[in-house]
From Swiss-Prot:
SMART domains in UniProt: ELM2 (SM01189), SANT (SM00717)
GO CC terms, sorted: nucleoplasm; nucleus; protein-containing complex
Keywords annotated in UniProt: Nucleus, Phosphoprotein, Repressor, Transcription, Transcription regulation
Residue ranges of the region described as Disordered: 1-60, 113-170
Record bears the keyword Nucleus: yes
Biological source species: Homo sapiens
Domain SANT: 277-329
Name of the protein in its database record: Mesoderm induction early response protein 3
GO molecular function: histone deacetylase binding; transcription corepressor activity
UniProt keyword annotation of Transcription present: yes
Length: 550
């Protein structure tokens, strides 16, 4: 009996009488290794399987004809020539004509371990055609199945099984049931009420139908009914004629009159049961108290009602707020009081000096009158201060810039090498009401033991601006410059001595290039040179610094 073997160059192999020694490689040994725990798990899994179904399948396949068995496993039937010849021959002759398909164990192992594609085809049925030669192609014309053809074979097997069971693929295909023909018919309710349930016998009543009369006609009708019933006071108080509230009773009367507007107005006005749900008119005093409380407490209507508007309920205050916010009165209120806008909420690098100057001048002028609070108008600024503020022009600013003395030439680093007496015991004078806001606190680099321009507090201090040593030889020239200016009238600027407005450097060596000083004074209308010290000592210090860096 000739034994089949695989050629080294052909994956399918051919029949040969030569025997080859099988030497397993390292990869084969790696895959062949198995752990004892894995074997025990597989044995436990096999014990739980039911092999009765497999035995029944094998017995069924043993009684099947050869053609049906080949078709069941995906093989094509034999060609007619072979079929005719086999029909006339006996089973023993047919067995003699078949090739010898016995395989050596080594050849089977080589076929199983030759690759990943062939590992999946490890059944004996798949191996049978792989070892046949061209002589067996007449009986088995179909070669070994590959992975690409496996899906098609599975589909054909499924179709064969469906055909054997008597169900066509069209019958097994699911269909989405959408359409009128799939809707269920719900029969009328034929149940009975329980003993505790009460049968609903009342008839529902239509109160309003909005699709009959135009919306503009309905609004005119509601306005007319509100004017006839005395609600015109509220309409005059809150932007007359622009906002209309729904009146269900008036709409119901219009429906009962078959949408006859004239008849509905007469019946609604003559009917004593006509609803007066609209809020009563707010007096001018109540409106002013509400607006004043809104500035103090915000939208806390409980505090508004408790402290200012005690004649109204909290609900009435809330309703009035929403109607008042849509009126022209709110626009006037917001314009006069800046309601809803946070003051001084500007860009960090921009300060509204004039706005703050006016506001702080009002605060120094005394308490605001009660009449000014109720009318929500700020107290008028005194004429003297207005004249001073209006006197500032571009020429004044130019004069202020030119009047400030330059310490030295910015291009000369060693310009301030002269000695300067220490000022450790010099008292500090405080300046009140200098409405200047810090825009940027300048930090200059230091070198060696000297701290270059360290301000201990923000404010203005006494100093003697004589020749002083502010730059050391070791210190480097800073990249930033300190700029300051004095915002006062020119006449006052000529009288005030610079010695009264200085900086105490606490006996430190500092490095400053081309410094200028800036002071903004509010109450300077009647000041003179003799009254400067009194002005400086009579006010509290404002913790602000006027420093601008270039």
């Amino acid at each position: 009996m000739a034994e089949a073997s695989f050629g080294s160059s052909s994956p399918v192999g051919s029949l040969s009488s030569e025997d080859h020694d099988f030497d397993p490689t390292a990869e084969m040994l790696v895959h062949d290794y198995d752990d004892e725990r894995t074997l025990e798990e597989e044995e436990m899994m096999d014990e739980g399987k039911n092999f009765s179904s497999e035995i029944e399948d094998l017995e069924k396949e043993g009684t099947m004809p050869l053609e049906d068995l080949l078709a069941f496993y995906g093989y094509e039937p034999t060609i007619p020539a072979v079929a005719n010849s086999s029909a006339n021959s006996s089973p023993s002759e047919l067995a003699d004509e078949l090739p010898d398909m016995t395989l050596d164990k080594e050849e089977i192992a080589k076929d199983l371990l030759s690759g990943d594609d062939e590992e999946t085809q490890s059944s004996a049925d798949d191996l049978t055609p792989s070892v046949t030669s061209h002589e067996t192609s007449d009986f088995f014309p179909r070669p070994l199945r590959s992975n690409t053809a496996c899906d098609g074979d599975k589909e054909s097997e499924v179709e064969d099984v469906e055909t054997d069971s008597g169900n066509s693929p069209e019958d097994l295909r699911k269909e989405i049931m959408i359409g009128l023909q799939y809707q269920a018919e719900i029969p009328p309710y034929l149940g009975e009420y329980d003993g505790n349930e009460k049968v609903y016998e009342n008839e529902d009543q239509l109160l309003w139908c909005p699709d009959v009369v135009l919306e503009s006609k309905v609004k005119e009708y509601l306005v007319e009914t509100s004017l006839r019933t005395g609600s015109e006071k509220i309409m005059d108080r809150i932007s007359a004629g622009t906002h209309t509230r729904d009146n269900e009773q008036a709409l119901y009367e219009l429906l009962k009159c078959n949408h006859n507007i004239k008849e509905a107005i007469e019946r609604y006005c003559c009917n004593g049961k006509a609803s007066q749900e609209g809020m009563t008119a707010w007096t001018e005093e109540e409106c002013r108290s509400f607006e004043h409380a809104l500035m103090l407490f915000g939208k806390d209507f409980h505090l508004i009602q408790k402290n200012k508007v005690r004649t109204r309920t909290v609900a009435e205050c809330v309703a009035f707020y929403y109607m008042w916010k849509k009126s022209e009165r709110y626009d006037y209120f917001a314009q006069q009081t800046r309601f809803g806008k946070k003051r001084y909420n500007h860009h960090p690098g921009v300060t509204d000096y004039m706005d703050r100057l006016v506001d702080e001048t009002e605060a120094l002028g005394g308490t605001v009158n009660a009449s000014a609070l109720t009318s929500n108008r700020p107290e008028p600024i005194p004429d003297q201060q207005l004249n001073i503020l209006n006197s500032f022009t571009a020429s004044d600013l130019t004069a202020l810039t030119n009047s400030v003395a330059t310490v030295c030439d910015p291009t000369d680093v060693n310009c301030l090498d002269d000695s300067f007496p220490p000022l450790g015991n010099t008292p500090r004078g405080q300046v009140n009401h200098v409405p200047v806001v810090t825009e940027e606190l300048l930090t200059l680099p230091s070198n060696g033991e000297s701290d270059c321009f360290n301000l201990f507090e923000t404010g203005f201090y006494h100093s003697e601006l004589n020749p002083m040593n502010m730059c050391s030889e070791e210190s480097e020239r800073p990249a930033k410059r300190l700029k300051m200016g004095i915002a006062v009238p020119e006449s006052f600027m000529n009288e005030v001595s610079v010695n009264n407005l200085g900086v105490d450097f606490e006996n430190h060596t500092h490095h400053i290039t081309s410094a200028k000083m800036a002071v903004s004074v509010a109450d300077f209308g009647s000041l003179s040179a003799n009254e400067t010290n009194g002005f400086i000592s009579a006010h509290a210090l404002h913790q602000h610094a006027a420093l601008h860096s270039e």
